[in-house]
Amino acid sequence: MKKTASHNQDGEYHQEGLLQLTLEGLIPPNQILVLNLELRTATLFYNVPEGNQTMVEQQHFSPNGMRVLVPLLRAYPKYCLHEVLFASLVSLPLEEAYQQMLEMRALTIRSVRRAVASLPSRLRAFGWQVRSIRGAGYLIEAIPTG
């Protein structure tokens, strides 16, 4: 079986169930976040000067938590639309998710809100929080210090 890997210009690296993100501004430049989509884990690694990596933090997420975490992180530093989160949550193409949200707004928003509500305790370990952008979506950001 051949392993496939791809890079994109936003600092993402994807390889069979692994998603690596640099998240400039959310994590230090010498760290990388690796999402294991199968195990539903997020692991923060520190790149040691000798070329090795040291694990800084790891958290395990619920299935729905991981389904909304991925688009939130991909949207960073911008917010992620409710429609994108709902599409990821229910595994629908964006157009279908948008149509369902038009037809059943309260129900779809509630399911997104419930999935996002599972994130804060896990994200705190990384020093992050999720903020609601009223009527639009959610934003992942660093917890303000001070």
State where each predicted segment sits.
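Context-gated lysine
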Residues: K2-K3, K78
